[in-house]
Amino acid sequence: MAKMYRKLALCGGEGGQEWDDDVYEGVRKVYVGQDLNRITYIKFEYVQEDGEVVTTEYGTTNQHPKEFVIQYPDEHIIAVEGSYHQVALIATEVITSLVFKTSKGRKSPLFGPNLLGITTGTKFVFEDEGKKIVGFHGRAGDAVDALGVYFVLDTTPFPLYKLDAQGGTDGRVWDDGSYDGIKTLRIDQDNSRITYLEVEYEKDGEAKTCNHGGKGDTPSEFVLGYPDEYIKSVEATYQKPNIFSNTAITSLKFLTSKGRTSFFGYNVGKKFVLEQKGHRLVGFHGKEDAAIDALGAYFGPVPTPTPLIPSKKLPAIGGNEGVTWDDGVYDGVRKILVGQGNDGVSFVKFEYSKGKDLVPGDDHGKKTLLGAEEFVLEDGEYLMNIDGYYDKIFGVEEPIIVCLQFKTNKRESMPFGMDSGKKFSLGEEGHKIVGFHGQASDVVHSIGVTIVPITTTE
């Protein structure tokens, strides 16, 4: 059996870059750094199912960070308390204090500036009746701007993420649960908010319709090409339209796996996004009254069609640091984007072909001011090999990718980066590359490929 995870919304400010560690078996260590005003740095040591340790870090280290050790596997974090506040010369709020609580009744030191244990700012608590925290997400730049957590809940037939409802705090709680997929959405609005949401789900070949809020005369309809199309993300806004009404959802924007978008409502108020990278939306929950007051979602795995030709994954090469990613398996690669930083490759993104569709992969790493360069494959061209180099650089514990060069059945790309460090090559004779995987943080630490045999028709 798999597990269901509850993803709590971020607390803190809107500055910095968004990051998401996803989930692991447990947390082994937490390191926290601070200056006179705020939490400037956070680092996590996670343990995977196979026992391998994965490290992630965010922010900047101005002083030697303090360490909090969890006695894994007999002890785990069950709660995080903290505060956030706007400090001098910073436009948005940042995290100003953190305390971690464990299943053994222990507390970490109070991290962050404080006067005799007294902190300032808006306080927050992440806790779910003793449930185990198995991952973190947040925002960070020069400091830690915001923080959120993942709790592990019940066992399910497949991995499932429940993203907390965001929006207003009033109204009746509703929860559709999770399904195989979504076929149709029907949405109505008045002059200031989303008043009605109707969802047609499918489970085990049978349709089920759930509706919430107050239905008007002519709701708008958004039909998905189920099962080949699914919702990747929902971008929403919420605010209190007037003194007589609850805070409610004011707009909804749906993005699908086919690249289609559909917008409803009025783009006013505070924004939030419901998304779990590499997963698809399979259910909604939230709060309702005369309108949709709050909205959350369930995300499940994207079904992977069994390829007619068996694929083979070649292990990633480089350093063991950052968030693990895997774009999956496709028919081929159509476009490659590579961004470089001062010391190596900081960013990669791939566009794949699947049947007649072009499927953009996720961003991996972080773009710098230098932007990204493109290598576009032509019709009848396929990727056969990658050559590259990886090396250790100052300030980073694990090696990073410093150069990449791509070879097709027709030509070679220019080298992206400098040929220094250890050289590597990925590919096999008689095969083509149909997917990528690896690890990345603000840089690309490692890269691997998925290959299939070249057919006689290619």
Swiss-Prot record:
InterPro entries: Jacalin-like_lectin_dom, Jacalin-like_lectin_dom_plant, Jacalin-like_lectin_dom_sf. Keywords: Lectin, Repeat. GO terms for molecular function: carbohydrate binding. Transmembrane segments: none annotated. Disruption phenotype: Larger PYK10 complexes. Residues 5-153, 160-301, 311-453 form the Jacalin-type lectin domain. It comes from the Eukaryota. Belongs to the jacalin lectin family. Component of the PYK10 complex, at least composed of PYK10/BGLU23, BGLU21, BGLU22, JAL22, JAL23, PBP1/JAL30, PBP2/JAL31, JAL32, JAL33, JAL34, JAL35, GLL22 and GLL23. Inhibitor-type lectin that may regulate the correct polymerization and activation of BGLU23/PYK10 upon tissue damage. This is Jacalin-related lectin 22. It comes from Arabidopsis thaliana (Mouse-ear cress). The gene is JAL22.
